[in-house]
């Protein structure tokens, strides 16, 4: 069985070491790189093609915060992102996860959940991914949600004119901050298989 390829991103050398020891000691995981900042993480994600990216949310003074780096990685690669954070405020973490199109998150205070979360995310989804997806879709009207599901290839009856549907497609992409339908399908295949 192929190991889960993991890229870790954290600006704290002590936490980097902890990630190296924890993930690196797992027989079903391969730590492909550890990066101290978002810019390097984006490059490493393209170079190493990880399955999972562990992204620290608070990358201090590194030029790109964790949520933005995670979003860039999600938009440009097939990697799934797990947000790591010392911030125990759930709303902050959900907001960042939504912005980053993350698959899940782990509070650093609950570090023992990291390995199971990596495995669950690599296998398909976590309970958090459903929460994040629901939060992402919250901004859409019911008509836009129907159009959203049709864009994903779901069999949905759309009761509008072609022009209205085209306008709703544009609205869905704008609200989700996505450039096109292909990117929407790429991002949401993580949440909906």
Indicate residue ranges for each PLM-predicted region.
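Conserved acidic segment of CheY-like receiver
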Residues: 2-15, 19-23
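Alpha4 helix (beta4-alpha4-beta5 surface) of REC/receiver domains from two-component response regulators
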Residues: 68, 88-105
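A short, hydrophobic beta-strand element within the central beta-sheet of small alpha/beta folds
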Residues: 78-89
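C-terminal output helix
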Residues: 89-93, 109-119, 130-131
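Helix-turn-helix DNA-binding segment
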Residues: 130-170, 174-175
